[in-house]
Amino acid sequence: MIKEYYGAETFILNKDFAYILVIGTTDVSLIPGLTIAGATPELTHFTPAADAEYVLLGKCKSINTIPVSPTGIPTPALLTRASLSFINPLKIVVNAGSRILPKIPYIDLQGEPGKDIRKQALSMEKVNNIIENSIKLGEELSNEYELIMIGESIPAGTTTAMATLLALGYDAMDKVSSASPDNPKELKRKVVEEALRNLPTDSLQRLAKVSDPVLLGVAGTSLGFKGKILLAGGTQMTAAAAIINEFDKNKLKDITIGTTKWIVEDKFADMLSLAKQVGVKVLASMLDLSISAYEGIRAYEKGYVKEGVGAGGSAIMALVRGVSNNTLVRKIDELYGELVGSNNLHI
């Protein structure tokens, strides 16, 4: 089942599409207690590369296991790979600025890893590189596809998303989600408030100060693409949509955010109000993982992880094409079981 918000419609998704995964890092993820998108703050810089490797290969090369939370909850890349296995679209990894580079083929936007937003996230040179090169990528994809789905992997991305939304004038304080069931709102607020001090007046310079490479890469690819776009992600994609809207007021009519029920039902965030403010449509997968054989998968139903790597959008694409909830969960369990059996995961 898929829920539709703000005029979103699923029929536009019934065509061939390419899956684009934009990866990057931000030094904000090194702040202790801010994100659980990695077993330790230091390992969060390996998460995007490992996510990309797993989606393409079914195994990781940059680290010897798939990314997990400190309590062992697996990356949403598992859900993405399971969903896409029923469709087998073209998959493209785009490096917007990852500290660790994936050991697979990828497109490089000539960006840089995001630094601490309390000081300066990105140089203007790299911001321009990311936007210009991703626009070109979107234009090229338009030659082959009428629909693309864009996912993201960047630990601490909800914090940079909140800073970005606020910098662009939206009411976003405390409204973004977290990979943890215990959203560290006070810490996020403190980091973001410090980042927003002495903001420049120019929009692009504001983004260079407080944003991250992934948001810019997602926005640029969308700006360059001529067809329909499913932004596969949670509250981060509302920030990407806000950037898109900053540069092209007509673009959002072709864009829908595709996410999970765990995001839209998150009591500690308000993704739908953010989407409404920005003016972007939303679809949410009602995928139910409570029937999984594995505790690590069932943990998603308790508010862990929630979204990432295009998990919600990928599930929507599978469900739209007739894959049942039970079939999809069986596939997720099968892939998870392979990882457990090969000692590539400890539960």
Curated annotation (Swiss-Prot):
In terms of PANTHER family, this protein maps to: PTHR38811, UPF0284 PROTEIN SLL1500 (PTHR38811:SF1)
Protein origin, superkingdom: Archaea
Spell out the protein name for this chain: UPF0284 protein LS215_0030
User: What species is given as this protein's source?
Assistant: Saccharolobus islandicus (strain L.S.2.15 / Lassen #1) (Sulfolobus islandicus)
Please give the positions of the paired cysteines in each disulfide bond.
none
Query: What family name appears in the similarity comment?
Result: Belongs to the UPF0284 family.
GO molecular function (one): nicotinate-nucleotide-dimethylbenzimidazole phosphoribosyltransferase activity
Transmembrane residue ranges: none
Tell me which Pfam families the record gives.
Answer: DBI_PRT
